[in-house]
UniProtKB/Swiss-Prot annotation:
Major place of residence: cytoplasm
Catalytic activity, EC: 2.7.7.3
Name listed for the protein in its UniProt record: Phosphopantetheine adenylyltransferase
Compartments in which it is found: Cytoplasm
Cofactor: Mg(2+)
Function comment: Reversibly transfers an adenylyl group from ATP to 4'-phosphopantetheine, yielding dephospho-CoA (dPCoA) and pyrophosphate.
Organism: Ruminiclostridium cellulolyticum (strain ATCC 35319 / DSM 5812 / JCM 6584 / H10) (Clostridium cellulolyticum)
GO cellular component, one term: cytoplasm
Length: 160
């Protein structure tokens, strides 16, 4: 069974993330979207909220699960008996960082592969940071995030 892991902070999940999730789920038997618990970051959405948003976004998908993790990614990949890490790339700048991470992961776990997926051209400019900045200032985020969670993102800034 081919098990892939797609890690990220997903703060919040964007249509770019969803594009990678949908495409990756078509080439594996089981895709785990792994939401990183990173103590050094100050996320807008709690880990529970990010997991909940992702579950809404992939509702109805039969081979996708959402989990959170902390610590080393390769340890989580081994724990899930997965064999591939999926990383989405938007630009050359993403590649430089992700290549270093892939090589480090390969050093730590030689049997785990990293598969780079290019973002669809429609989302090559998109990041969670950009969505948050737009939402913070009342900009239009429709088309940038899954429609089913758009209101929750907008409402988050109304509470701040």
């Amino acid at each position: 069974m081919n098990k892939f892991i797609y890690p990220g902070s997903f703060d919040p999940v964007t249509n770019g993330h969803l594009d990678i999730i949908e495409r990756a789920s078509k080439i594996c038997d089981k895709l785990t979207v792994a939401v990183l618990i990173n103590q050094s970051k100050n996320p807008l959405f709690s880990i529970e909220e990010r997991v909940s948003l992702l579950k809404k976004v992939v509702k109805g998908s039969t081979n996708i699960e959402i989990e959170c993790f902390s610590g080393l990614l390769v340890d989580f990949v081994k724990e899930k008996n997965a064999n591939v890490i999926i990383k989405g790339l938007r630009a050359v700048s993403d590649f430089e960082y992700e290549l270093q991470m892939a090589l480090l992961n390969k050093n730590q776990a030689p049997d785990i592969e990293t598969l780079f997926m290019m973002s669809s051209i429609n989302y090559s400019f998109l990041s969670s940071s950009m969505v948050k900045e737009l939402a913070r200032h009342g900009g239009n985020i429709s088309g940038l995030v899954p429609e089913c969670i758009e209101k929750e993102i907008i409402d988050k800034f109304k509470l701040k």
